[in-house]
Curated annotation (Swiss-Prot):
Biological classification of the source: Eukaryota, Metazoa, Chordata, Craniata, Vertebrata
This protein's name: Beta-fibrinogenase mucrofibrase-1
Active site, renumbered: 64 (charge relay system), 109 (charge relay system), 203 (charge relay system)
Function summary: Snake venom serine protease with strong beta-fibrinogenolytic activities, angiotensin I (AGT)-degrading activities and strong kallikrein-like activities in vitro, releasing bradykinin from kininogen (KNG1). Intravenous injection strongly lowers blood pressure in experimental rats, which may be explained by the action on angiotensin I and kininogen.
Listed GO biological process terms: proteolysis; regulation of blood pressure
Any one GO CC term of the record: secretory granule
Organism this protein belongs to: Protobothrops mucrosquamatus (Taiwan habu)
Main location as per UniProt: secreted
Note: Negative results: does not have activity on gamma-chains of fibrinogen (FGG), and does not coagulate human plasma. Does not induce or inhibit platelet aggregation.
């Protein structure tokens, strides 16, 4: 009965979702159903985001995905025909880089969510490890999510789409977007010639480079996937001490400047 209620709620959310958000994968293909057991679907205030399961109690996503009445779904592939092992959770606690929950396009767009109860691992639910080494420019990266697959007109898929993009030099993003500082805790990821990118609805989801979880999708150009307008992601490696500290119960830990 509980599972039936969860699946019904997911279908209702799919039908009521207003197709508004901050980032979706352009130029990709349907993800393999078995390649994203760590990918979570976040609904809030009629918006949609992605996120990443770190362990049975914690999800990492973008700070700008914070909202009221958040619902977190795990084990999802098709939203219309859910897997039997889909699980629904809500936040027990949320943690931000500072108490004011402030962030900018180049700093602190990161949020840790402690779930209301532990997740049960299953065929379609498993955590993703934090990175063991820093990201390297030139890496091939995988981006994924249920975001729009067309831009500027928005077309939202039933299943997550995945695309391979490259980790670019930060100066490429500085040239594309006025106002970015000389240094930041972000990554620049995309295809120089355009055609592939995260987009509206993908925010908060993972950027996986050479097999390691290196970024959190944050923002990008509008329309998405334009030449020399890559996506910008929060650098996970730069925030490892904060992430590990919060999970360990040290709420006094601070984010890097």
């Amino acid at each position: 009965m509980v599972l039936i209620r969860v699946l019904a709620n997911l279908l209702i959310l799919q039908l009521s979702y207003a197709q508004k958000s901050s980032e979706l994968v352009i130029g990709g293909d349907e993800c393999n159903i078995n390649e994203h057991p760590f990918l979570v679907l976040v609904y809030y205030d009629d918006y949609q985001c992605g996120g990443t399961l770190l362990n049975e109690e914690w999800v990492l996503t973008a700070a700008h995905c914070n909202g009221k009445d958040m619902e977190i779904y795990l084990g999802v592939h098709s939203k219309k025909v859910p897997n039997k092992d889909v699980q629904r959770r809500v936040p027990k606690e949320k943690f931000f880089c500072d108490s004011s929950k402030t962030y900018t396009k180049w700093n602190k767009d990161i949020m840790l969510i402690r779930l209301d109860r532990p997740v049960r691992k299953s065929a379609h639910i498993a955590p993703l490890s934090l990175p063991s080494s820093p990201p390297s420019v030139g890496s091939v990266c995988r981006v994924m999510g249920w975001g729009t697959i067309t831009s500027p007109q928005e077309t939202y898929p039933d299943v997550p789409h995945c695309a391979n993009i490259n980790l670019l030099d930060y100066e490429v993003c500085r040239a594309a977007y006025a106002g970015l500082p000389a240094t930041s805790r972000t990554l620049c990821a995309g295809i120089l010639e355009g055609g592939k990118d995260s987009c509206v609805g993908d925010s908060g989801g993972p950027l996986i480079c050479n097999g390691q979880f290196q970024g959190i999708v944050s923002w990008g150009g509008d329309p998405c996937a334009q030449p020399r307008e890559p996506g910008v992601c929060t650098n996970v490696f730069d925030h490892l001490d904060w992430i590990k500290g919060i999970i360990a119960g040290n709420t006094d830990v601070t984010c890097p400047l």
